[in-house]
Amino acid sequence: MKRILLYVHFNKYHKVSDHVYYQLEQMRALFSKIVFISNSDIHQEDLEQLEQRHLMDQFIQRHNKGYDFAAWHDGMKALGCEHLVDFDSITIMNDTCFGPLWDMKPYYLKYEADEAVDFWGMTNNRATKAFKEHIQSYFISFKKSLVHSKEFRQFWENIVELTDVQDVIHNYETRITTAFVEAGFRYKTVFDTTKEDSSSMLHADFSYYNPTAILKHHVPFIKVKAIDANQHIAPYLLDFIDQKTSYPASLIVDHMSQVHPPDAKYLLAHKYLPEQPISIAPSKKIAVHLHVFYADLLSEFLEAFSHFHFDYDLLITTDSKAKKAEIKGILRESGASADILVTGNIGRDVLPMLTLKERLSQYDYIGHFHTKKSKEADFWAGQSWRTELIDMMVKPADQILTTLAADAIGIVIADIPSFFRFNKIVDAWNEHLIAPEMNQLWQAMGLTKSIDFQTMDTFVMSYGTFVWFKYDALKPLFDLDLSEADIPAEPLPQNSILHAIERLLIYIAWDRHYDFRISRNEKLLTPFIDNKLLNLREGSVPHTYVDFDYMGGIKGALKYIVIGPAKAIRYIIKRLLKRRV
């Protein structure tokens, strides 16, 4: 059977996602020819990958005009109508779905053997006041009986580049079914949704609003938008796909973590470090930056570093020459070596790390830690925080670096320390006050992905900025070239630039097209603790306050709140006195 696939691709970040590679790999054997039509620019390395892996036979780069139908039209035009009839079937498809969840060959064999079918698809939409019943256009396959018809040729020859998506749906997506049905051709879908009960649905578009039904009816593709639109059940959809289909659910997590912010709840469920054999390439250059403010804690870190099974360079920063001398003595006693730099007492552990820009840029993997204590809180706040962070981020470094070897992973952070699960310290209303600083830094770094931190309730961060990362993942932060003038002096106020940076790390990596992983806290705590901590009536709403800024400050407020009402009262009294006279 000689088949051709016209495959339309679009990615706003100009990348070819792994799920697209997988899709084409799984379907390659079905087609004699694959035409890859991209409505967005793609990187040269992706183009080379598609060619080297034989996932396409012809490439068409076009501007994103006219949506998918104009792209399919251009593909057919490039092939030439006289050559289209050489194929037994023509399949049009786009990359807006994950799959195939199951082997596609049986589907093709079934409909090719059915003489009552001239064209077929995955799902259809029932007739409404606006549209007639039609196959949804993310996948349609046309058999030879239809391809050879004048109706088929006329439909595609009349495609023009429409600019309104509703016009495309009305003129092309619905008409591609009705025009052929009216000409006497017959169609079927894997899931005929017109016969399905939709009374509990907002709209009878099963591909978008009811992904559970899609899986139940063994539709081999599930829409990307359906995952995003149904996040409340996405964990269970992913579990089903992982357990009941042949599709790697990780491809869904990876793609959604790139095209949307990577911290959605259903995505976080898949962010723990994977269990895998330790493998660290000897060629990788590794640096550990340790900021030592409390020299009495240095030995604790040196002992933790003994768990490493890889070579690394230790770079220590501190705030005074006296501490540098003390650190040298501790290193000498322990038999350890390090480069020690005095960086001052501004910027805590973050600015010292950023000042090492030129040196750290030479390394493949970088670990960043500091001798953590909490002067503002109880002893156990700093003690538990530090020891748990060491257990999560220092001792399992072999496993962390094994995970960082994956091209898609750029940063590893710690899970939430237990102190923050027993005590409500990170509060959504206070986080909201940090968001403007985060937005400002985002703009200053010139990052390209769109995000507004003020719309978010809280952030995924490595508490205390203990972190492992690839330099490229955080390069924009280093390129800010922050100085002491940009950092407030100690004692550090709340919601400072340092607090903003602590919260920004995984999002900076996301903008660089990296995902993150979380090193698990082995201190097991029942989630009922979180339930008790977070579900409180008292203090669940912010205290009422008055913002005088829009009134012109305190003087303006006095005018509106005191002087204005006083004048009104005086006027009323005068009117009453006149009436008596």
Regions found by a protein language model. Give the residues of each.
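ER/Golgi luminal nucleotide-sugar-dependent glycosyltransferases, focusing on the catalytic module
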Residues: 1-581
